[in-house]
Amino acid sequence: MEFNLRMADTIHDSYEWINLHTCASSRCMAEGRRIPFFHNDCFCFRLYDISDALVAAGDYTFDPPAYEKTRRSHRIKRILALKLRDKLQIRLPAETLMAIAGLLVRECAAVTAEEQSLGTKVSHHTVDLTQDVYVDYTIVDGVRYVKSLGNTVPKLCNQDHHMLLSKQGEPVGKIWIAEDYRGIRSVKFCSADASLAGPTPIVKSWWRAISAPCDIEKITIRSDGLKLRDILIYDETIPNNTSNYVGWANPEHPNNVIDIMTFDQVHSFPERLLMTCFNCNANGITGYTAVTSGSSVAMIHAHENDNTGFYADMDAAYPRGFFIHMPLDDGEFVTEVCRRYALAAGKWISACLVFITNKGRNTLFGTSGPPESCPVLDRILTPAPNGTQIWFNDSTSVHPKSVRYLAFDELAPPVQRPFPPSLIPNPPYFWTQNTEPWFVSSCNMKGIVDMTLCRDTTLAHRPITGILLEYENGHRECLGQFRFDKTLKKVRVEHTTDLYIGSLRTTCSYLYIADVATSPLHDCGSLSWMRVSRHGTLEWWSSLRHSIVRYTSDTGQLTNMETRT
């Protein structure tokens, strides 16, 4: 039976005698059992009846990263290509095998999940930690998970597949768990005061620790029949602490977490909070990129080793996010991390971050507000010049998606400081004509020697979205939305050469920058060119629809607002 599903709608299936409610809010999901849905092709392709174990094995502990679907597909394709090479009677090139495997990824995943779930069942059982504890592993889509924990080795199992995790009589005060959205990947037992320092072999997973005031004697294991999904302390006298379910990207992390909306230290955590980090002021850092919705920050990345692969992950997680890049000069480092708290467009509460450096650079990772919204900043952290690890919540683990929780060593009360004058905009007239968020960046035109343009070729009109400018003294500035995965060649600019900014409008009349050159391009007759001299200030006002530039000098002010469709 086919249904035309709409959100917040309930459909009655008279054949199965069930109601399908499509709200999917947390309240509705908690009130009743969720109904599993399958692709129609996968359901028709099934070899066996859908079992509870199969549904449980495919259930997610928490929402997976946006990029995980692609990574899982690539893993399955590589595994399947190797199997095809071994099974086929003819020898085919690796490229051909990968192409064939790419057409069978979904079918391979469906059949493998069915076969692995045969003969298994969802179960809960107790493990005595005062006795020997054995661990067994399984492979799911090329990823290793913990299959079972127990006090004995099953007689029919090969003992070489089981490992002794803990010996009888060894006290257990803390349990380290590495997991991803599909299950538990590693378990470590240790004493209450022990840390799990150093590198671990578990990548792309989240670490959390279960601890108790006294030694843990018994635990309850929850399994989906294929792999472990949760571990609980088997003692009703010990409260279930919400911090036991905070996942960290590394087992070595600070313990104090603050809420940047209230500056209160967090003791009761949101369900399945995930914390990741970036290295501030570490050796080799050349700048920072933040993704923002305007009223809040969603993600912060520290640039090192010229890696651009993270952009694909950011695009998948935040398809409508705005990218703000803050470059660093030689010898420059962040001296203050501050919070800007204000009312954003539409009266939304805005809690953005501001980075201030030792060379006077001030960068607001968020939308610019009117002057009355910029009274003071709250300094949250003074990073060490030789490096500080700053932890923030993965925005997909909270609602709304934004950075709300921070963690770092040596927490201190926030300190108010004056708002940097460079971050207080002089709003143009279009500021008051709509409520969409505007992102402002500016630069001095004197002394520029190089510029690198950033063009978004994924859009039909291929706009210039940002510029990285380099000065004769080594200083660097960014205008607009600059990304290193969309850059064009660096252009040398002579000291006396004016810049020409060519603008156009889309079919919806949205203004954008089509080109930036040292002379107007005559073969682009439809462009509206704006001449910018090598003195004065150039501002770039960006929204999710428009790119407006404004040039101010002693002789007056120019904008590209007069550009026609």
Please provide the spans of the model-predicted regions.
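Lectin-type carbohydrate-recognition ectodomains
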Residues: 1-565
